[in-house]
Curated annotation (Swiss-Prot):
Keyword check for Iron: no
Pfam families the UniProt entry points to: Gln-synt_C, Gln-synt_N
Keyword vocabulary terms for this entry: ATP-binding, Cytoplasm, Ligase, Nucleotide-binding
Quaternary structure and interacting proteins, as annotated: Homooctamer.
PROSITE patterns to which the protein is assigned, alphabetical: GLNA_1 (PS00180), GLNA_ATP (PS00181), GS_BETA_GRASP (PS51986), GS_CATALYTIC (PS51987)
Reaction catalysed by this enzyme: L-glutamate + NH4(+) + ATP = L-glutamine + ADP + phosphate + H(+)
All residue ranges annotated as the GS catalytic domain in the record: 108-354
EC number(s) stated in the UniProt entry for this protein: 6.3.1.2
Organism of origin: Agaricus bisporus
Annotated protein name in UniProt: Glutamine synthetase
């Protein structure tokens, strides 16, 4: 399938005067964990989320409602600047609700918000490491030899140079777009498998972690669309001796970040161990293909922890263990997680003692 996006043809129109009106692009999570969007015109610059209307869409076309009762409502939840249109135009992350006012089954933000409201005094911070893999229009890993394979893993992680990294221009575009949009992106790097990359978002407190990661994902797939490239969040996109893709989740509370916080980190690890199976249940589909005990993972059936151990379920960074306070890294979440589910269950387990 050829790339049908014509940036050169579009550019002159994006510079046209909009008058006092702006474009607000609503973005939501569909029934299959993907992202959807549509745009409305707003009569003036938006400075507060309360100025935006509740909108609706055909949920029968997104696997979120039956055809005979298909209206699903979009309630604005967070606003970001629009890096595609510029100016005062905005991106609106929206929650989905059924016509009876209940949250749609795919709306995990609704529950997460309740959890974080309850845990607010503990100031839970998160940082997510989103790994993903790029494919070309023919579903081949981007930049790989046609009908063949690149050399074994080794030179690609944080690599530089032709043959070691692929699509750096796309990755740089995404990084800058996130910064412009107001997403708290904190870094990028090429990953162990060629054509696999990672971006980090955070630290973000509470519900904002999910908001920022979902919008960062949206920007990624939109920019990849312009390049004619596909983005896969599958945790094991290729069989064989290739690393899978995760979404390592860094977590701390106010008590963990203060002097003597190591005790609270150890307490949290004990609590996480007791609910291992419940966490795995929301840590991503097909995660068993990734959590094999190989390729820098712990086995999906076993809980483990250790200092600087990338083969453990929970890793405590060495500098954290040395200084006696900081954060922990949960290495179990897959790349295709819903961040609202992962961050909220961590807060439930470690803070609310659910």
């Amino acid at each position: 399938m050829a790339n049908t996006y014509h940036n050169d043809l579009l550019a002159p129109y994006l510079s046209l005067d909009q008058g006092d009106k702006i474009q607000a692009e609503y973005v939501w999570i569909d029934g299959d964990g993907g992202l959807r969007c549509k745009t409305t015109t707003v009569s003036k610059k938006v400075t507060d989320i309360g100025q935006l209307r509740i909108w609706d869409f055909d949920g029968s076309s997104t696997n979120q409602a039956p055809g005979h009762d298909s209206d699903v409502y979009l309630r604005p939840a967070a606003i970001f600047k629009d890096p595609f249109r510029g100016g005062d135009n905005i991106l609106v992350l929206a929650e989905t609700y059924n016509n009876d006012g209940t949250p749609n089954r795919t709306n995990h933000r609704h529950h997460a918000k309740k959890v974080f409201d309850e845990a607010k005094e503990h100031e839970p911070w998160f940082g997510l490491e989103q790994e993903y893999t790029l494919f070309d229009a023919d579903d081949q890993p981007y930049g790989w030899p046609k009908g063949g394979f690149p050399g074994p893993q080794g030179p690609y992680y944080c690599g530089a140079g032709t043959g070691k990294v692929f699509a750096r221009d796309l990755i740089e575009a995404h990084y800058r777009a996130c910064l412009y949009a107001g997403i708290n992106i904190s870094g990028i790097n090429a990953e162990v498998m060629p054509s696999q990359w990672e971006f980090q978002v955070g630290p973000c407190e509470g519900i904002s972690m999910g908001d920022h990661l979902w919008m960062a994902r949206y920007l990624l797939v939109r920019i990849a669309e312009q390049w004619g490239v596909k983005v896969s969040f599958h945790p094991k996109p290729l069989k064989g001796e290739w690393n899978g893709a995760g979404c390592h989740t860094n977590f701390s509370t106010k008590a963990m970040r203060e002097a003597g916080g190591m005790k609270f980190i150890e307490d949290a690890i004990e609590k996480l161990a007791k609910r291992h199976d419940e966490h795995i249940a929301v840590y991503g589909e097909d995660n068993d293909l990734r959590l094999t005990g190989r390729h820098e993972t712990g086995h999906i059936s076993n809980f483990s922890s250790g200092v600087a151990n990338r083969g453990a379920s929970i890793r405590v960074p060495r500098h954290v263990a040395s200084q006696g306070y900081g954060y922990l890294e949960d290495r179990r979440p897959a790349s295709n997680i819903d961040p609202y589910r992962v961050t909220s269950i961590i807060a439930e387990t470690t803070i609310l003692d659910k």
